[in-house]
Amino acid sequence: MPLGMAWEEIVDSELGIIIIRAEDCLHCVELRAILSEQPLSAPMEWIDKQNATDLYSQYPLFAASVDILPFAGIFSDGELKQVVRAATRERIEDALSA
């Protein structure tokens, strides 16, 4: 994945993943460590839930779905295709292959 891709580029790509995180989320830290060792097959961007206002305003259904962190949204060509609650590498991979 190219470094520094903005969330807009991820969402507009053929297949991209946005992961919502929080500073106090231990599962988010664990997932980030796992994904740094074993990257996913699609471009990905991490967004702190406090900084997701623009994303949420463009994708209100995604915003309304966010509950258990880390929370992943799988996008394709500007459309939300799938969400993954309490995301793990395995759950995200399953959603990508669905």
Language-model segments: which ranges?
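Thiol-based oxidoreductase modules, predominantly thioredoxin-like and allied folds used
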Residues: 3, 20-21, 40-57
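Short Fe-S-cluster ligation motifs
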Residues: 53-69
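Local sequence-structure signature of Cys/Sec-based thiol-disulfide redox active-site neighborhoods
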Residues: 2-40
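Short, glycine/charged-enriched secondary-structure capping and boundary segments
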Residues: 32-35, 60-61, 87-89
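Eukaryotic short linear interaction motifs
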Residues: 26-27, 53, 92
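Residue-level detection of beta-strand scaffold positions
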Residues: 17-20, 43-46, 74-75, 80
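Non-catalytic, surface beta->alpha helical segment in thiol-disulfide oxidoreductase systems
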Residues: 68-98
